[in-house]
């Protein structure tokens, strides 16, 4: 299970993903999300860590390269050829470029003012991973939690929401508070169920996330006590030489 301290690194990505979904220009506008109200509780099991000492050592190297913004060191940790970058419209990797160049494009590492290196460090700190069925021998992180997909689809239809509106607690008994303050009254403690997130407007990343509980009550939880559903993922492969970054799944850099 991802610990709270590790998930906290993804706090900025959590809010970025919610904000991106709300601010992107769209074509035909979908119906507005249903107002806060009760919804069916869908059980969720957090992802498990990969039990492999070599993977832990690899992530440490990856984190060190990210902290130093050392592209040369990073290049040694990425496949030379065969890197994939899966987006909604297919594989966007440039097969004429090296793996590290494609990874840099996916994360926006060439943007000095961007968060690409911080995102890379965040990925490196996550010990979870799940297999990518269409690519044998590939695992991607952060791994998604386990839940009933059919029930989740029905839940999104009932609430007129999409994947980006949902999160899950990283541990049992996460405290929900009446206000976004550490000393605010605790209104309830959460079970291991999917949660509807309703972030408040604002450019700063807050300490608390506004949510709607299955009972339909609005409350606030510490942002590092939950994790998003459907996050971007970085993917790894392992061969005779060890672990390598082999691909990326998600929107990546907008440039």
What are these regions (language model features)?
Residues 108-168, 212-255:
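Boundary regions of SH3-family modules and the immediately adjacent low-complexity/disordered segments
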Residues 82-99:
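Short, charge-rich amphipathic alpha-helical segments embedded
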Residues 24-64, 76:
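Short, low-complexity N-terminal intrinsically disordered segments enriched in polar/charged residues
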Residues 1-7:
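Positively charged n-region of N-terminal signal peptides that target proteins for export
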Residues 19-23:
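Boundary at the C-terminal end of the N-terminal hydrophobic targeting segment
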Residues 7-16:
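Bacterial N-terminal signal peptides
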């Amino acid at each position: 299970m991802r610990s709270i301290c590790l998930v906290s690194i993804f706090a900025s990505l959590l809010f970025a993903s919610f904000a991106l979904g709300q601010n992107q220009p769209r074509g035909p506008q979908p119906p507005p999300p249903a107002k806060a109200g009760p919804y069916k509780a869908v059980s969720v099991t957090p992802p498990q860590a990969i039990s492999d000492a070599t993977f832990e050592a690899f992530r440490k190297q990856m984190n060190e390269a990210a902290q130093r913004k050392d592209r040369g060191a990073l290049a040694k940790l990425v496949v030379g050829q065969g890197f994939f970058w899966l987006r909604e419209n297919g594989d966007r990797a440039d097969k004429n470029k090296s793996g590290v160049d494609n990874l840099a494009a996916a994360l926006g590492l060439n943007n000095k003012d961007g968060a690409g290196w911080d995102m890379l460090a965040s990925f490196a700190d996550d010990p979870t991973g799940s297999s990518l069925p269409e690519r044998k021998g590939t695992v991607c992180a952060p791994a998604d939690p386990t839940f009933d997909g059919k029930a989740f689809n029905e839940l999104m239809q009932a609430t007129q929401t999409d994947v980006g509106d949902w999160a899950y607690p990283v541990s049992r008994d996460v405290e929900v508070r009446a206000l976004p303050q550490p000393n605010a009254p605790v209104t309830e403690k959460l079970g291991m169920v999917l949660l509807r997130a309703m972030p408040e407007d604002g450019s700063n990343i807050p300490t608390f996330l506004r949510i709607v509980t299955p009972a339909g009550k609005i409350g606030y939880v510490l942002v590092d006590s939950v994790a998003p559903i459907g996050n971007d993922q970085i993917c790894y492969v392992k061969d005779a030489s060890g672990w390598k970054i082999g691909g990326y799944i998600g929107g990546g850099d907008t440039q």
